[in-house]
Structure formats: structure tokens, C-alpha cells
Amino acid sequence: LCLGIILGTSVLSMAQMTGKENEKLIPFGDFNSWMVRIIDESFVIGGNTKTLYEVAPVDTIRGDKPYISSTVSPWRTSNVMAKVSGVTKCSISVFPEKRDDGYCVRVETLMEKCKVLGIVNITVLVPGTIYLGQMHEPIKDTKNPQSKLNAGIPFTETPNAVVFDYKMETPGTDHRIKATGFSKIVDVAGRDSAEIYVILQKRWEDKNGNVYAKRIGTAIERLSENTPDWKNDHRLNILYGDPANQAGSKSYMQLIPKEQSLYCINSKGKSVPVEEVGWGDTDDKPTHLFLRVSSSYGEAYIGTVGNKLWVDNVRLAY
């Protein structure tokens, strides 16, 4: 709840007038503040020391302590610590990078390999992702990736657009790969794209703890072309209600299929899917905002190694 309050009120001090619109920087959305986690992986997989980065107040945390989220930053990354059968392994696909006098964020699609006593036995494709929400650490398996997240933050406003700076680098191949770690690596048809995914939901919970949602607003964009120079003040309009017949609508803006639902923590403290059941009406107001920036789109463990997206100054326009 405190993150929703931070986003909805305290950012007013960071608002800027641009033309007739008022822009609010999402807290820590200038990516100038990073927390560092230093974790020793288990000896049986090499015992390497890994550095994981999180968008949060400057700090250094040493040791394999689970990290859910910051109490003041709404962001979480796909940088994560896993513990499987007592073995500690880290995955790193999000990085701070210098930009002018500050920093930006780079998300990158990578291949993570795990060797046990020098023998390769697990290879996983990992897209770099930042999002608003939390992560349930330590990760214990690769099943149902969405259930590892508490996706979204409390939010009741209705912005016109998301605005950000970006640049992109991609190999530009017309196929992707799928590598889950426990099965054969296979080719997947189609070019990979980075994705900026923003939805506003009106959520509610029934007496049994099930959570449902109406989709209030949608703003999704896929980027698949090399953009070597920064594109500043890029605007992504939020479409309210069913976007099907609205300008800017895309086929991938539909409601989330039940089997791919986001997850949240219900009032009983249990991680449950958020089932989208319809589009919002004109009188509906959102209860939650979910924003995700990823170097690859679509299902987990699918993408093109080498996709890189740099993002900076993520804000909401009103």
C-alpha cells in the first residue's frame, strides 16, 4: 500500500509541466539510484561471487538474503537468487549504465548456464525485465514464472500516457529460441521484440480469496528495430476500455488469458492469479498499475540472445 501512496502523492513534487500536460516521474524512474546485492553462489556450481542490481535507494547487501522489494521504490528486476536443493544460483539480466551525468537501466536477453562440478546440465534463456511489483525469493523452480511475482502496485489515477527515453540493440534474426533449463533447446518462429507493457486494472477479491480484474487501461508497445541513438520523450498513449476499435490498438492488447494470468497476494496472504474477466466501463476507476519493461516479449524462456533495451526517465503524463 505504501508504494501506491508514494506513486500517487509524493511524486507531485517531481511533476513537470510540458505543454498542457503534467508529467510525473515514477519514483526511482530516473534510474539514478541502485542497490547492490553481493551473493556467493554454491561451491558445487563454481562458487562465483555475483553482483545483482536493484532500482532502490543506494545500499549494499551482502549474503544470500532473500529480497522481495524495497519499502520505498516500486520497482523490482528480474535479477534474482534461486535456491534449489540447497544450491544457491543467481541470474542477472538487468544492469545500471552511465548516461550523461546520471544512469539509465539496460535490460538484456541472456543465456544462463549452470554447471554442477564442471558439467553443464541446465541452460535457461533469461530476458531482462524491470517491473512495478515484488518478487518471491528465493526462486525454487522454473514452473509457472508468473506465480513468482506480486505484479503491480496500488494506483487509482488515470494518466493519458507513459513517457520515457529509450534506445535498442537487436541481432535482428527472424527466429527465437526456447530454453527452459530442463528440456531440449528449440527454435521458435518469429522475430523477437522488446516490450513495454502497461495495464491498469480494477481488482476485487471474492470470499474464497480468488482475485478478479477488469482491464481499465492498456498501453503496450513492441520494439524490434535497432535504435542506436537515444529517442527521448517517447510517448505511449494509454487506451481506456476495450482498445479494439481505437486508434493505436494492436492485436496483443487483448485481455490476459487465464492460464497466463498475473499473480498477486490476496487478503489471506496467499499468492493467487489475477483473472481478467472483462473490460472496464467509463465509470470504472483502476485499483492497480502494472508496468513492465522487458528485452523480449511473450512466454517465459523464449527470446533472442543479444536483445538489449536501454530505458530512462519513465513518467506518467496527465
Residue locations for each model-derived region?
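Substrate-binding/catalytic groove segments of enzymes
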Residues: 174, 243-251
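Interfacial segments of alpha-helical transmembrane regions
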Residues: 180-186
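A short secondary-structure junction signal
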Residues: 174-179, 208-212
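Aromatic (Trp/Tyr/Phe) and Gly/Pro-enriched flexible surface segments
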Residues: 16-159, 163, 189-241, 252-317
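Bacterial Sec-dependent N-terminal signal peptides
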Residues: 1-22
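Extended, low-complexity, turn-rich repeat/linker tracts enriched in Gly/Pro/Ser/Thr and Asp/Glu
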Residues: 168-175, 186-191
